[in-house]
UniProtKB/Swiss-Prot annotation:
Protein name according to UniProt: Tryptophan synthase beta chain
Record-level Gene Ontology MF annotations: tryptophan synthase activity
Chain's gene name: trpB
Domain of life: Bacteria
Disulfide bonds: none
Alphabetical list of InterPro entries matching this protein: Trp_synth_b_CS, Trp_synth_beta, Trp_synth_beta/beta-like, TrpB-like_PALP, TrpB-like_PALP_sf
Length: 401
């Protein structure tokens, strides 16, 4: 059966929907109409395609990681090189699409939330390109962890709001951005950074990120003359993974692995393993798996990587998990640091800490699958933003002599 989600109410099975105050309902409905129109608009599609090619640098390579494969001692590992995009991660695919859509809707301001700062940088970049006013909401903790990205956003002309509510991380930045959107919905578009939020956001972000899997599928067929046995990608909100997975959803022979952040371990309170440890609940306008206590209070997510410590997961991922289309696994901070070092030393590629979770799991999976099998790993971003943090962490552990 051909996959056909979401339904016309924006649900993926039981997950998804539009759980927003009346004040935002008009805005999400307006966005729905504008997005559907843009899909049929050849001028819009041509402009987006041209920007992805000439500005972002797509298509990026599908690279056979020979030495990483040898290190793992099993399945052939291919890397989809989203780290080579302009701004250094997959986030630009979605930011460009949404800012172009905002322009088409006649909005002159954009706002966005950011965790690691990559989506903030991508949105500020797209806003600069189109001459739009841009405000980014970022948790105070993340502002400290990612000061370089804060400077980048300001350099690109964006205002960065440090959010001091709650645990001062990504979920609090989303809350602040949604509140701000309610107040200025007439002239402002909210650029959602992941496959989260009320419909149509999860679908819009998925569709703009699907370029990852569309390219990877064609590139893999060209190189191997068959489809891969497995796909591996890290999952916070889940946009790079959904971008890789979605174009393969009807290829039943292809297994999909979403790698969540286990932080200090899933049996401690310090992790972000939403599928493993969460249960369905409503957060940020959508019904999805959420980390919550027995009273339904949202728990704090934790990860070494600022881009993965979100207490929810995109509703389509919750659906994939519920119907068994994808498997969700987890990798600890320690394992991710090991992945960070392994890829750097075997391939000369320094990955983002988010992507390092996928690398660490891919090495384990490659051993299990054996040398006859093949896989694609989404290398969602480069590690420049994380080098100082990793340096401090490893020096504290006396690993670097």
């Amino acid at each position: 059966m051909t996959y056909n989600q979401p339904n016309n109410q924006g649900f993926y099975g039981q997950f998804g929907g539009q759980f927003v105050p009346e004040t935002l309902m008009t805005a999400v409905k307006e966005l729905e109409v504008a997005y559907e129109d843009s899909k049929k608009d050849p001028v819009f599609q041509a402009e987006l395609k041209e920007l992805l090619k000439d500005y972002v640098g797509r298509e990026n390579p599908l690279y056979f990681a020979k030495r990483l494969t040898e290190y793992a001692g099993g399945a052939k590992i291919y890397l989809k090189r989203e780290d080579l995009n302009h701004t250094g991660a997959h986030k630009i695919n979605n930011a460009l699409g949404q800012v172009l859509l905002a322009k088409k809707m006649g909005k002159n301001k954009v706002i966005a939330e950011t965790g690691a700062g990559q989506h903030g940088v991508a949105t500020a970049t797209a806003a600069a390109l189109f001459g739009m006013e841009c405000t980014i909401y970022m948790g105070e903790e993340d502002v400290k962890r990612q000061s370089l990205n804060v400077f980048r956003m300001e350099l690109l002309g964006a205002k960065v709001h440090s959010v001091t509510d709650g645990s001062r991380v990504l979920k609090d930045a989303v809350n602040a951005a949604l509140r701000a959107w309610v107040a200025q919905v007439e002239d402002t578009h909210y650029v959602m950074g992941s496959v989260l939020g009320p419909h149509p956001f999860p679908q819009i972000v998925r569709d703009y990120q699907a370029v990852i899997g569309q390219e990877a599928r064609a590139q893999f067929l060209e190189k191997e003359n068959k489809l891969p046995d497995a796909l591996v990608a890290c999952v916070g909100g889940g946009s790079n993974s959904m971008g890789l997975f979605y174009p393969f959803v009807n290829d039943e022979s292809v297994e999909m692995y979403g790698v969540e952040a286990a932080g200090l371990g899933i049996d401690t309170p310090h992790h972000a393993a939403t599928i493993t440890k969460g249960r369905p609940g409503v957060l940020h306008g959508t019904l999805m798996d959420v980390l919550q206590d027995e009273n339904g209070q949202i728990l704090e997510a934790f990860s070494i990587s600022a881009g993965l410590d979100y207490p929810g997961i995109g509703p389509e991922h919750s659906y994939f998990n519920a119907v068994g289309r994808a498997k969700y696994v987890d990798i600890t901070d320690e394992e991710a640091l090991e992945g960070f070092k392994i890829l750097s030393r075997t391939e000369g590629i320094i990955p983002a800490l988010e992507s390092s979770h996928a690398i660490a799991y891919a090495v384990k999976l490659a051993k299990e699958l054996g040398s006859e099998k093949t896989m694609i790993v989404c290398l969602s971003g480069r590690g420049d933003k994380d080098v100082v943090q990793v340096k401090e962490r490893l020096e504290a552990e006396k690993e670097v002599k």
